[in-house]
Amino acid sequence: MLKPLGDRVVIELVESEEKTASGIVLPDSAKEKPQEGKVVAAGSGRVLESGERVALEVKTGDRIIFSKYAGTEVKYEGTDYLILRESDILAVIG
């Protein structure tokens, strides 16, 4: 399993709908980049200049919304993930 370092989290993307409300099927090229995902792993936290470690506000299992162009896409064991910094997370769902 991927283990993120510091203030980074590993996200499994939640794919958007493939059809519009009127039933039109969208090709991959017309879909927007997903901004929602599920945290599958979280780093140990951010280190302050004083050396103190601050724990992350998100945890494994949280559903989140993140900045549109944030993070680095990686493929691991056939699954697509996104690794991003906690500061790129905009909200936790639920």
From Swiss-Prot:
Presence of keyword Chaperone: yes
SUPFAM superfamilies recorded: GroES-like (SSF50129)
Pfam families, alphabetized: Cpn10
Locations listed in the record: Cytoplasm
Keyword rRNA processing in record: no
GO biological process: chaperone cofactor-dependent protein refolding
Subunit relationships: Heptamer of 7 subunits arranged in a ring. Interacts with the chaperonin GroEL.
PANTHER family, per database record: 10 KDA HEAT SHOCK PROTEIN, CO-CHAPERONIN GROES
Family, similarity comment: Belongs to the GroES chaperonin family.
Alphabetized NCBIfam families for the sequence: PRK00364.1-2 (NF001527), PRK00364.1-6 (NF001530), PRK00364.2-2 (NF001531), PRK00364.2-3 (NF001532), PRK00364.2-4 (NF001533), PRK00364.2-5 (NF001534)
Name of the protein described by the UniProt record: Co-chaperonin GroES
Organism: Bacillus licheniformis (strain ATCC 14580 / DSM 13 / JCM 2505 / CCUG 7422 / NBRC 12200 / NCIMB 9375 / NCTC 10341 / NRRL NRS-1264 / Gibson 46)
Gene that this polypeptide is encoded by: groES
